[in-house]
Amino acid sequence: ALLSFDETTTLFHEFGHALHRIFADGPYDRTSGNVQRDFVELPSQVMEHWAAEAEVMKVYAKHYKTGEVIPAALIEKLEKSGKYGQGFATVEYLAASLLDMDYHVLKEVPANLDAMEFEANVMNKRGLLKQIPPRYRSTYFNHTMGGGYTAGYYSYIWAEVLDADAFEAFKETGDIFNQDK
């Protein structure tokens, strides 16, 4: 398949959700794999680390006609590009998380609520830069308005903390493929 690196990362991410669901052990199928929102993104986001690991990329990142493995120089550039703009991305997620929480502490939604004004007030109240808007705007923020993340969108940022620690445990073994350690 001809996937971009972003698409490959998404594939690994969604595969992490699938593995979590498949290997979750519970008495009832419909509830097995259900965990607190704080944890739900950990299995998927830890899988993203494997997508970006040079050792793993050499297994899947090959030319579709020749089978030539991705050059080490290109892997290095991909690693560097993953760090570029990290502060911007974190603020985007943080802004969306704060917006999500502020929507869910409203006692009632005013009939004349101006979503853009509400967003601006949330960002100003928290001292966030208006140049870096929330990752998702109110008008299409599906996670918080119906995607099951009500007041829990912060779990993506929290999962980054957890998944970095979890993946580091694999790296500390000296072999990220070792199933025994």
Region spans (language model):
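Cation-handling catalytic/transport regions enriched in His/Asp/Glu
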Residues: 1-181
